[in-house]
């Protein structure tokens, strides 16, 4: 069952409800509920309530994956509402915590395999990512969060007419692995 949660912060609460339902029906040993969430969602109170509830009920069939990119729509997470030490906070609510580089697909796969082997509590995978990775004018810049390239001019960045072309070229030649198609 795939579900888009709508309001920011409600996805984990919905996932906890699904995991509790499976536990009540005895299905918590053969399937998992995944909640993909952003670090910015930690500003919402219901996220913390869901974390506590899942830990209390030892929802071993629940795996949360947090995109820890350090930005949200209005700025950097640590400037708006500091989250660190984030792993310690999840752990304090009785979650097993796994931290990985979010751009390393092999590490993510291994983290999910590790999560499947935890039987006494829910698991959170904190995936440390770089927003806009590989695009020089968007990388780590919250001003691009939620806005597609080519739709607006941002001071100091390429004009909107050139943004997509530049971004595609940079992504295709990321780390020199592919030759440019747009030179």
Predicted regions and their residues:
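Glycine-rich ThDP/TPP pyrophosphate-binding loop and its adjacent helix/strand module
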Residues: 1-182
């Amino acid at each position: 069952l795939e579900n888009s949660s709508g309001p920011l912060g409600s996805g984990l609460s919905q996932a906890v409800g699904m995991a509790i339902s499976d536990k009540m029906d005895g299905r918590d040993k053969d399937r998992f509920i995944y909640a993909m969430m952003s670090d910015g969602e930690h500003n919402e109170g219901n996220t913390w309530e869901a974390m506590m509830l899942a830990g209390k009920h030892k929802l071993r069939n629940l795996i949360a994956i947090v995109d820890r990119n350090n930005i949200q729509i209005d700025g950097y997470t640590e400037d708006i509402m500091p989250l660190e030490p984030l792993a310690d906070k999840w752990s304090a609510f009785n979650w097993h915590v796994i931290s990985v580089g979010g751009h390393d697909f092999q590490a993510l796969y291994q983290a999910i395999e590790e999560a499947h082997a935890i039987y006494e509590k829910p698991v959170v995978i904190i995936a440390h990512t770089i927003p806009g990775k590989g695009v020089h004018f968007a990388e780590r810049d919250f001003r691009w969060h939620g806005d597609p390239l080519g739709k607006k001019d941002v001071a100091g960045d390429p004009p909107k007419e050139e943004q997509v072309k530049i971004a595609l070229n940079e992504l295709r030649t990321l780390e020199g692995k592919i030759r440019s198609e747009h030179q």
